[in-house]
Amino acid sequence: VNWCFKEKYKMTPETRDERFAVETESPIKYNGDIVISSFFQVLKSEKWVDATISANIKTASGGRLCDARFTDAASYWFDVNVGRNLWKSADGKASIRMQALAGFYCWMTNDMVHRQNDAISYGVGFTGKYRGFTLATNLAGFYGYENNGDRPIHWRNNLRYEIKKNIISFRYTHGMKDNLYETYSLGYIRCF
């Protein structure tokens, strides 16, 4: 389960106008959409590749639709993720891994002619680990059929530090096509 508990934002008047939003800053507290995901490992091999499939659904429960923060539409997606260690230390505390993703993404739109948009999703990236630190970088996006801003490409980076079952995460995302925005986030993850 993934959920944006609280978001505070600030954007320029130009960005507000491009998004047809009302405010440039968050005037009230609000919550984000809820995403429920299931992951299934279908192959685990040191010699070949590891492979997982996932099924995901996003609710339409987020707030501040008037400021283009979340959507009032559900979506779902399925994907296959494969990865392989390119290098691993003898003690297993350090590694470099390559991974790739391909899938299908579907979401509801507010277009009266095309009530739904579908896309092929893709991604490729690398992950480096050293003791409790993990640095991941990848290039990912999807390719929708309407070609109306539905073909974004993002360069995503994530630095995490794990202490026992607690993870502190810092993320940076750079939009390269259709979604030309910079995003920074700080997160806490509790592993059960």
Can you say where each PLM-predicted feature lies in the sequence?
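"Short basic amphipathic alpha-helical interaction patches in structured regions
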Residues: 52-54, 67-71
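Flexible, glycine/proline-enriched loop segments at strand-loop-helix junctions
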Residues: 24-25, 65-69
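Sequence/structural signature of outer-membrane beta-barrel proteins
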Residues: 4-8, 43-45, 57-67, 85-89, ...
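Transmembrane beta-barrel strands of outer-membrane/channel proteins
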Residues: 1-3, 51-59, 96-106, 124, ...
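Transmembrane beta-barrel domains of Gram-negative outer membranes and organellar outer membranes
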Residues: 1-58, 78-89, 133-137, 165
